[in-house]
Amino acid sequence: MFADLNSLPLSTLAKAQKSLSRKSSSSSSNGRSKEEKLALMKSKLAQMQRSKGKAVAVPDTDSHRFGSRAQESDEESDSGPETTSSTKRGSKHAPAALSTKKQVSRKRQVIEVPKPERRDPRFSSVSAGHANADLHSKSYSFLPDLLRQEFSGLKEAVAAAKKAEKNCPWAEKPMRTAERERLEVQMGQVRTKLVRTEKEAMEREVLAKAKKEEREKRTQGKAAWFMKKGESPKCEKKDLLLKARFETLEKQGGKTAVKKLVEKKRKKLASKEKKSRPFAKGAEGMGRDTKRRRVA
């Protein structure tokens, strides 16, 4: 065998020696790396148990036999999770934890200043002042006429929509019905605006007439008289407006319209009175049974 080795050239022997040394070094490094990984895992487990306050059952003395290199790698690997776990809460009821490395702002809010609200100067009470209802009604006196024109146009449109809904094919029925309902809702809104506008105009006219009469009486030497305001039964303003309302209604629809309004008001008050009763009509008390029983 030795004779065979002596017959080989030196270059071949050098290559063989190099390959053998490489295999031996790789096997030793693999074994060492496995031992280092095991030691690191043991040290991490021991550190986690210490942080939770449990008894350390895994010895971490194996990590010292590999020198400072293993210790440095252990510290580098543990530095990341340790900083993140320090800011975590132990439970959901615990207060939030903040890192001490974060710089605190030097700004302090000593007095809470209310946040300024942006206002439109056109509609602000500070710049616009009090609105004059008489001046507003005179400036926009054309609005009631526009509302009447719009109401008459919508009335005609509703009549045409009803006719189209009645004569349309079955497939177009839902579309025609929706269009008719939309026009009716719009007409109701315009009617409400028109009635409110006419009522306000009537009230302003009645109050202006009463003030004019009072000024004339003062010029004749009579004492000053001020109209009582409010919702009391002795309120002159309420009585005056109610009387003017009935007079206007009588001019428009006659005495029949006034009777209908009075009857409607009476029924409304009667229903309110019935609802406010402590027990039903004919019952003698709250505890008794008011149902009729069949007599055998």
Curated annotation (Swiss-Prot):
Subcellular compartments: Nucleus, Nucleolus
Could you tell me the Gene Ontology terms of the biological process aspect for this record? Answer: maturation of SSU-rRNA from tricistronic rRNA transcript (SSU-rRNA, 5.8S rRNA, LSU-rRNA)
* Source domain of life: Eukaryota
- From which residue to which does any coiled coil extend? 147-203
**Pfam families for the chain:** RRP36
* Chain intervals with Basic residues compositional bias: 262-278
Annotated region Disordered: the residues are: 15-135, 253-296
Q: Low complexity: which segments have biased composition?
A: 18-31
Determine if Membrane is one of this entry's keywords.
no
Sorted UniProt keywords: Coiled coil, Nucleus, Ribonucleoprotein, Ribosome biogenesis, rRNA processing
InterPro entries per UniProt: RRP36
What is any one of the record's Gene Ontology cellular component terms? Answer: nucleolus
Extract the PANTHER family matched here: RIBOSOMAL RNA PROCESSING PROTEIN 36 HOMOLOG
State the similarity comment. Belongs to the RRP36 family.
Entry function: Component of the 90S pre-ribosome involved in the maturation of rRNAs. Required for early cleavages of the pre-RNAs in the 40S ribosomal subunit maturation pathway.
Q: Indicate the quaternary assembly.
A: Associates with 90S and pre-40S pre-ribosomal particles.
Q: Which protein are we looking at?
A: rRNA biogenesis protein RRP36
